[in-house]
From Swiss-Prot:
Belongs to the glycosyltransferase 4 family. MraY subfamily. Pathway: Cell wall biogenesis; peptidoglycan biosynthesis. It is found in: Cell membrane. The keyword ATP-binding does not apply. The lineage of its organism: Bacteria, Bacillati, Chloroflexota, Chloroflexia, Chloroflexales. It comes from Chloroflexus aggregans (strain MD-66 / DSM 9485). Catalyzes the initial step of the lipid cycle reactions in the biosynthesis of the cell wall peptidoglycan: transfers peptidoglycan precursor phospho-MurNAc-pentapeptide from UDP-MurNAc-pentapeptide onto the lipid carrier undecaprenyl phosphate, yielding undecaprenyl-pyrophosphoryl-MurNAc-pentapeptide, known as lipid I. It catalyses: UDP-N-acetyl-alpha-D-muramoyl-L-alanyl-gamma-D-glutamyl-meso-2,6-diaminopimeloyl-D-alanyl-D-alanine + di-trans,octa-cis-undecaprenyl phosphate = di-trans,octa-cis-undecaprenyl diphospho-N-acetyl-alpha-D-muramoyl-L-alanyl-D-glutamyl-meso-2,6-diaminopimeloyl-D-alanyl-D-alanine + UMP. It is a multi-pass membrane protein. This is Phospho-N-acetylmuramoyl-pentapeptide-transferase. It is an enzyme of class 2 (transferase). HAMAP family: MraY. The chain crosses the membrane at residues 16-36, 62-82, 87-107, 125-145, 158-178, 190-210, 214-234, 240-260, 264-284, 326-346. InterPro entries: Glycosyl_transferase_4, PNAcMuramoyl-5peptid_Trfase, PNAcMuramoyl-5peptid_Trfase_CS. Keywords: Cell cycle, Cell division, Cell membrane, Cell shape, Cell wall biogenesis/degradation, Magnesium, Membrane, Metal-binding, Peptidoglycan synthesis, Transferase, Transmembrane, Transmembrane helix.
Amino acid sequence: MSVLRAVLVQDMARALLLAAAAFILTLIVGGWWVHFARKHKLGKRIRPDGPQSHLVKVGTPTMGGVMIVSTVVVLTVLFNLVDRWSMLLPLGVMISFAVLGAIDDWLSLTGTRSKTHGFTVRFKFWIMTAVAFVASLALYLPQPYGLEHEGLVQIPFVGEVNIGLWFIPIAVLIIVFISNAVNITDGLDSLAGWNLTLSFGAYGVITFLAEPRLTNLMAFCFTVVGACAAFLWYNAYPAQVFMGDLGALSLGATLAVVALQSQQWILLPVIGIVFVVEALSTLIQTGYFKWTKWRYGEGRRVFKMAPLHHHFELLGWSQPQVTQRFVLIGTVAAMVGISLALIFGSPQSQTQVDQPAMIVQETDGVR
């Protein structure tokens, strides 16, 4: 076995072991959290204007994202905090958005803000934007102040493109949009959890094959995969616990940061197609309703209900049918995203892989 191959195998083995450890630890934490949430009546409130079939979920424990976030943070700090800058960024974003989501969940549960059932949309938006701006600066700034990505992006059929300072506002938009998109998708049992598992898994493979220098990020992705898989144990239909804003906002923002760090964020709409379509369906529904109300005096709708998974429920699909079909779409999209990343990968990364391989071959020849 060549030296390069041995290193790659070792990196993948470490990532898979972290995924397995995350799965086991999340199962343990999850069992405790479900019991704790039921005991203290941390049950979710269900929108009365949603599908009537969802009313049976009233009182189901929420804030289940804590089992994922806590596991990922602990395992990353203990076993994957080697390159501090590259790992502190996704960890910092995950924790920041988790705190915001946890407070919002708590206010919703306690009724402290009975009129809004949590933070106002505008307040959450500006907090999320502020955190996303700091993360974008950290990605753009040169070392030792940042990760020195300098606005580089890999575009299929084009190659490596430097978009300069435009990277910062684009990165902010991606982080805020994907965070909210995952939150919107988290409306059916295991729907968000499955698609997060697929998306992080896809970027784990991409960073392993297309960007070997980001092996710590690969290990981080697989840690999240293991934790999300264990969460599905409790979130499978009928769910024992919901992810809540704590999990959805934090994992969505973290997924966006991982995509940005890998320089393959242009593929995020493909890999995370379910999240993107769910969010767009809500924006289209809201925008069209407001426009028709202004234009015709009455609000009209494009879909029976937004987001899109509710539309299909009202068409007669059962919740498991909607989830399984959306997951199948997400699976194919993840495979397509990985394929595009490999076909149109970074020339720089290919050079970095080929050079060690040449060195190994020359060494073998000397022996």
